[in-house]
């Protein structure tokens, strides 16, 4: 049964990681309804995210290679620092700093109290409303060539908010991008690139802890988690292409209503003790 549950959670991770609806919240919610009725845990979540971030690397492979080459070239002087690809490399590094620092400072809280379903429900609703405002009032004039270092660090703090399940990594960064005047597609694209260092760092750290301790602190072992990670990669790759096409022509209204309704449903389920916090 654990294999089936892990496969289902891998599917959920792949479907939700790149949408502004919080994959960690969905893993937490779906896990409560499975036979184990348990939180998959922060380690399981972080490791399966390695699958979806690998999908980002494969999907944006040419862009990433170009950015990395230009960034290294800027270090040796072969490429000017203001080269767009070199700048993007620096912007990704800069934007990754907040989540790394805050993730280390609040690691214990992230793995325990912040995974409360009450917090998940609240964050789904609150940040759904903020996304609605950003989508409505954002000028949506800027593209990524206009991304400044100041905006890069603001993106980074928005990403760090996703350490709280229910906020959504992509939701937080996309919301910040819209509020700063970037187009929906530009905000989503930078969100995907920005997540790579943070997610790989967190996932590899949790994988190291898991291997060192010979097991996961949760209902699923390493083999089941590996299966979930592979499924998350395959499904996530498909979702990236679909999502970028979707946001190029449509608003985020669908995701806003989904977040709010899901959060309200969680309040009801928690209030009637159908699921535990």
Swiss-Prot record:
Subcellular locations according to the entry: Cell membrane
Membrane topology: Multi-pass membrane protein
TM region positions: 88-108, 117-137, 157-179, 191-211, 227-247, 255-275
UniProt GO molecular function: undecaprenyl-diphosphatase activity
Keywords, in A-Z order: Antibiotic resistance, Cell membrane, Cell shape, Cell wall biogenesis/degradation, Hydrolase, Membrane, Peptidoglycan synthesis, Transmembrane, Transmembrane helix
GO biological process: cell wall organization; peptidoglycan biosynthetic process; regulation of cell shape; response to antibiotic
EC number: 3.6.1.27
Alphabetical list of InterPro entries matching this protein: UppP
Catalysis: reaction(s): di-trans,octa-cis-undecaprenyl diphosphate + H2O = di-trans,octa-cis-undecaprenyl phosphate + phosphate + H(+)
Gene Ontology CC entries for this record: plasma membrane
Pfam families for this protein: BacA (PF02673)
Misc note: Bacitracin is thought to be involved in the inhibition of peptidoglycan synthesis by sequestering undecaprenyl diphosphate, thereby reducing the pool of lipid carrier available.
NCBIfam families in alphabetical order: PRK00281.2-1, undec_PP_bacA
PANTHER family from the UniProt entry: UNDECAPRENYL-DIPHOSPHATASE (PTHR30622:SF4)
Family: Belongs to the UppP family.
UniProt function note: Catalyzes the dephosphorylation of undecaprenyl diphosphate (UPP). Confers resistance to bacitracin.
Name of the protein described by the UniProt record: Undecaprenyl-diphosphatase
